[in-house]
Regions:
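Conserved C-terminal helical docking segment of ANL/AMP-forming enzymes
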Residues: 278, 292-296, 317-368
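Conserved ATP-binding loop and adjacent catalytic segment of the adenylate-forming AMP-binding
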Residues: 55, 128-133, 145-157, 162-218, ...
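C-terminal boundary motif of the adenylate-forming
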Residues: 252, 257, 291-317
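Conserved ANL (AMP-binding/adenylate-forming) active-site segment centered on the GW(Y/F)…HTG consensus within
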Residues: 197-200, 227-250, 285, 325-336
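Conserved C-terminal "lid"/linker of ANL adenylate-forming enzymes
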Residues: 296-299, 348-402
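Conserved AMP-binding A3 loop
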Residues: 1-13
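Conserved AMP-binding/adenylation subdomain of ANL enzymes
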Residues: 10-27, 34-140
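Conserved ATP-binding/catalytic segment of the ANL
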Residues: 206-273, 290
Length: 402
């Protein structure tokens, strides 16, 4: 276990004003298990320091309903939560009458253009401001009420990579969804985008009083009062992780001329194909998860001739699709095996393949025919597929694709 000192935690709580701001007494909702350092930061440490109101969900299954009831002003969620909100909205829009669909698409284009101007530090012209106002009154306000985000001042996502397109979608709606970065060994947050400085596709700048640099191997290193004291009972691992005060995060990335940090992938997850091509699987996986029908994905291909993928389907949305198309099935496994569902996922994968170079495209895929929950060993507490566990458990399924 990682040993965190009282000083580590106090630093995070007192330093948060530099990247959150303290203009209001926030009301938040706590969804993730408190064993997760980011959730403990947002639901315990920061509320104690800033006197926020904390609401706890009744259960993971009621999290979206509880969010609608509370309508938090500040909200931290993992990418899967934001992906699910997006996919639920897309499905509902697709089921709406033609006039509703047209209004949504038009409003989204206007909102996206408006957000691009704002994020670039520009000033939208009068016509665009007027269009954005109409879009807010006719479309966006209702969507935000439906999502429980109508009072949201600031939203954060972290704990896993997120698609830039997903953040852009929320920005188009007028919601400040900001990506941040940290880990248990840093007692919480190391970098963050802010309302004043936000660059989509990055994890923001180093927060106040924290230093960031990239070593000769491309690994992100950080230094500051938030760095932990070491791993309990494991001085060897501690010595490998913290050298001369610098924490070796295990993430590969870059820092641009303005100080914004961009993560490529986990060092251990980089795929090197049989042809010697280095590929970041998370970039492909993020694009796949932007589909309303794909809950998660694991790209395979290390030391192999081509890339394949294991897909975890979004049960609710795929179930609705099957019912609307009158596709017969008996259980989750039979639903996953239906040719119509395989074709549906195949189309989504081809749409993603079109965005990447040929060597980075998915050549074959298989659907995991089990409905996984946080209690299963394949998933983390934040609903991420554990790559090594999945590759080991489904090794025969992977082998069948080569």
């Amino acid at each position: 276990g990682a040993m965190l000192s009282h000083q580590n935690l106090l630093f995070q709580a007192r330093n948060a004003g530099s990247w959150i701001g303290d203009e209001a007494r926030e009301e938040i909702i706590s969804i993730l298990p408190l064993c997760h350092i980011a959730e403990r930061t947002f639901s315990v440490f920061l509320p104690l320091n800033f006197k926020w109101i904390v609401n706890f969900v009744e259960s993971p299954e009621t999290s979206f309903e509880n969010t609608m009831e509370v309508s938090p002003t500040l909200f931290f969620g993992v990418p899967r939560m934001w992906e699910k909100m997006h996919s639920n909205t897309v499905i509902k829009i697709n089921e709406a009458v033609w006039l509703g669909r047209i209004a949504y698409e038009l409003a989204l284009k206007i909102g996206g253009k408006y957000a691009e101007y704002i994020d670039a530090g520009g000033k939208p012209n009068l016509l665009l401001r007027l269009g954005r106002w109409v879009a807010e009154k006719t479309v966006f306000r209702n969507l935000k009420i439906m999502l429980g985000l109508d009072r949201a001042r600031i939203l954060f996502t972290g704990a896993a990579p997120v698609s830039p397109e997903l953040i852009a979608w929320y920005r188009a709606l007028g919601l400040n969804l900001l990506e941040l970065y940290g880990q248990t060994e840093c007692a919480g947050i190391t970098t963050s985008n802010t309302k004043a400085e936000n660059r989509i596709g990055t994890i923001g700048k180093a927060v106040a009083n924290v230093d960031i640099r990239i070593d000769e191997n491309g690994e992100i290193l950080c230094r500051g009062p938030h760095v932990f004291k070491g791993y309990f009972g494991n001085p060897e691992k501690t010595a490998e992780t913290v050298i001369d005060g610098w924490l070796y995060t295990g993430d590969i990335g870059t820092v641009d001329e303005d100080g914004f940090v961009r993560i490529t992938d986990r060092k251990k997850d980089i795929i090197i194909t049989a042809g010697g091509k280095n590929i970041s699987p998370s970039e492909i996986e993020n694009q796949l998860k932007f589909s309303p029908y794909i809950s998660d994905a694991v790209v395979i291909g290390d030391k192999r001739k081509y890339l394949t993928c294991l897909i975890m389907i979004d049960h609710e949305n795929v179930l609705n699709f099957a019912q609307n198309q009158n596709i017969p099935f008996t259980d989750f496994a039979s639903l996953s095996a239906r040719p119509e569902i395989v074709d549906l996922i195949g189309v989504e994968i081809e749409n993603v393949n079109a965005k990447f170079a040929r060597v980075e495209t998915i050549k074959k895929f298989k659907i995991i025919d089990e409905q996984l929950t946080a209690d299963d060993e394949e998933l983390t507490a934040t609903m991420k597929l554990k790559r090594s566990t999945v590759e080991k458990k489904y090794s025969s399924l992977i082998t069948s694709m080569y």
